[in-house]
Structures are given as C-alpha cells and as structure tokens.
C-alpha cells in the first residue's frame, strides 16, 4: 500500500541508526525489492498451500502467489507474467481452493475462510475489547459502522446503523444484470427497504439520516448485520466480526485469464473467465478480451479495494475518473495523481533528503 500510494519512499531492511534517515527509492526500485523478496520466499518451499483451521490468517503459499501476481500485474512487468501465470495455475490445480457455489454466501459469517478464500484479515467480536483509547488491541472491525446508514432503525432488514460513509453509486447497482446475484450481495438498497416498510406500515415512518453523497445504496458485503457484534465487551461500533477478504479464488481465475490474454502462456482464458461469469448465473459465455476481464473484475470485486488500482494499471483511469454529474468529482485523473504527495512532516523528519512527488 505504501508503494501504491506514494511510490517513491524511504526503504530500509535493517534497523536504522541516528539520524534515522533511510535512502529514498524510486517506485521501480522498490518494486524490484518487493518482487525479488517474494521470489526468495517462494523458493524456500516452506509454506503450505493452505493452512488448517487453527492457523487461518497465517501466510500461505497461495497468499504469496496472489500478492506476487498483484504487484507484477500492477507494475505491468511482462517479463514476469509467465511466472505469475504459473503460480495462478498451481492454485487452480490445487484441490484446496474452488469457487463457492453461491456468491451470496461469500460475505456471510459462515462464508469466512470458505473454499474460495485465499487470505482474510481476522476480526472477532467474541470478548473483543477494542475501544476508542485502545484502537490497536485485538478485536473487531469498525468498517461496518463506517459504511452503514446513519441513524438507521436498528434491526430493520436485519441491519444496524452506522455513520453513513462511502455509499454505493446507483450506477454501480444498475451495472449488474437483474439476475446477477452479485448485485444484491454487493449493493444494499436501504432506501427501497424503508419505502416498502412504510408503504405497508405507514404509521411507522421509518427513515435514516442522509450523509454526504447519499444514494440510498450501501455496501452489503461488509454491512453492520444485526448480531454481528453481540459478544463484544467494549465499544459496539468498533467490534464487528466481519473478516476482511483480501484474496479470493475468483481473482485467481481472472488473473490467469488476463495473463493468458496478455500473452503470458498457454491456457484456457475463456474457461477461467466464464467460471466466474457463470457462477453469477450469467449463462451466455463471454470472450476473454481485456475489456471483458476488467469489467468482470469490476462486478466481482466492488468494495474489495481492486477497482481503482485496475483502472491505473490498465490505463483506464484518465477516461473513467472524470467529473461526475453530481458535482462531487470536479477534476479528471491524470498521471501526476498516481502517487500522493509526501507529507511535509515526513520530508522535515528526513532532513530534506526526500524528493516530493509531482502531484
């Protein structure tokens, strides 16, 4: 994330001594450090393809393979595409991973560490004591609170209230086919729920308080589901038990399809792409073009932190991230926006040795 956000950052792999200033590497230099480190780890041949249930959350070979493919593809390093494809196909050939039959089950509590899950960050509400004064202690996550509607009537539609941030765009909801189960598993139409309830029970007049950029739609994948923080012992809004899904098997398939389409090697890109496409109930096969693969990634991974980086690495950011009709986005993305500006306090702390990004 530091590499993706800031690109040109200080790097050190040994403890620093006074004055504690590390050499600033370029984004390309840092990439080489990361990718060769991963290659060294893989060559050790000590990681299991998947951990047993008592060790879920530990690094596995499949997780390292996915991280390797992610950074190689983000860097557009075609010299390593064939290696990344080999790693994806090792996961695909493993009996330890597969697609969940029903997409709607993936983000339920019962879907945590399913056969589709390659890596998750564990969160728990059981005796969780994370609080405002101790945010780094083990416990739950605050994400459901952040993204659920503000002053929502708790328990309605089995959802609880949050702070109303990060609503889902209506255009995202409408991008899905009506029979695509990913639509409702991703986009919760909260306003429609209240409208239907109030039509049946007009005296209730249920509502929630709208916040900035409200659309009536919220991210269902990590929503504040009633009861998912019932066993916490501290601040309920900070201790939800929703695990954060980092890598899923569907991404392995789409990575493989894309790498083959980009010329990384032989393989059935169409098969891999349509395994994901058809799992969503879409019976008409699609061709493995880069545009189709990136669109399938869009539909598959809304809210999972993939889309923005896909737009950058595929050169689509400048044409997609443009001023919107609502007045929220007023500037177009440009290549100078790829990296954030380095905070001035960090430049000061580095005794002026850091070169600022051209933001």
Q: Which residues does each PLM region occupy?
A:
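Extracellular loop and loop/strand-boundary signature of outer-membrane beta-barrel proteins
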Residues: 18-23
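Long, intrinsically disordered, low-complexity segments
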Residues: 27-29, 33-35, 107-165, 239, ...
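Flexible, polar/acidic helix-loop-strand segments at domain edges
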Residues: 171-248
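Extended, hydrophobic/aromatic-rich amphipathic alpha-helical segments that build helical scaffolds
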Residues: 1-11, 27-45, 55-92, 119, ...
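Surface-exposed patches in mature extracellular/periplasmic domains of secreted proteins
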Residues: 47-54, 99-103, 284-286
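An aromatic- and glycine-enriched ligand-binding surface/loop that stacks and positions planar moieties
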Residues: 39-40, 58-205
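Outer-membrane beta-barrel translocator domains and adjoining extracellular loop/strand segments
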Residues: 13-17
């Amino acid at each position: 994330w530091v590499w993706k956000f800031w690109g040109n950052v200080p790097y050190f792999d040994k403890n620093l001594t006074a004055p504690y200033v590390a050499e600033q590497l370029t984004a390309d230099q840092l990439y080489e450090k990361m990718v060769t480190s991963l290659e060294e780890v893989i060559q050790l041949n000590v990681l299991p393809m998947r951990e047993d249930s008592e060790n879920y959350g530990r690094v596995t070979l499949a997780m390292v393979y996915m991280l390797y493919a992610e950074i190689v593809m983000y860097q557009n390093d075609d010299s390593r595409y064939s290696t990344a494809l080999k790693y994806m196909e090792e996961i695909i050939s493993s009996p330890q991973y597969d697609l969940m039959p029903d997409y709607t089950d993936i983000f339920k509590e019962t879907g945590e560490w399913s056969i589709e899950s390659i890596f998750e960050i564990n969160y728990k509400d059981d005796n969780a004591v994370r609080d405002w004064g101790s945010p780094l202690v083990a416990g739950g996550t605050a994400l459901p609170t952040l993204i659920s509607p503000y002053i929502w009537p708790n328990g309605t539609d089995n959802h609880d209230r949050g702070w109303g941030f990060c609503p889902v765009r209506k255009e995202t909801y409408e991008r899905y086919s009506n029979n695509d189960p990913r639509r409702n598993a991703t986009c919760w139409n909260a306003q429609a729920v209240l409208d239907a309830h109030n039509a049946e029970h007009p005296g209730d007049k249920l509502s929630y308080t709208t916040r900035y950029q409200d659309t009536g739609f919220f991210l269902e994948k990590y929503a504040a589901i009633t009861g998912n923080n019932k066993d916490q012992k501290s601040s309920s809004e900070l201790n939800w038990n929703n695990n954060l899904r980092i890598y899923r098997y569907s991404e392995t398939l789409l990575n493989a399809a894309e790498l083959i389409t980009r010329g990384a090697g032989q393989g059935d890109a169409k098969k891999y792409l349509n395994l994901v496409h058809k799992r969503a109930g879409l019976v008409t096969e699609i061709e493995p073009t880069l545009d189709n693969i990136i669109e399938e990634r869009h539909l598959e991974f809304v809210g999972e932190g993939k889309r923005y980086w896909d737009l950058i690495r595929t050169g689509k950011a400048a044409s997609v991230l443009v001023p919107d009709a609502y007045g929220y986005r007023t500037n177009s993305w440009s290549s100078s926006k790829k990296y954030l500006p380095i905070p001035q306090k960090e430049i000061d702390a580095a005794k002026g040795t850091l070169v600022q990004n051209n933001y």
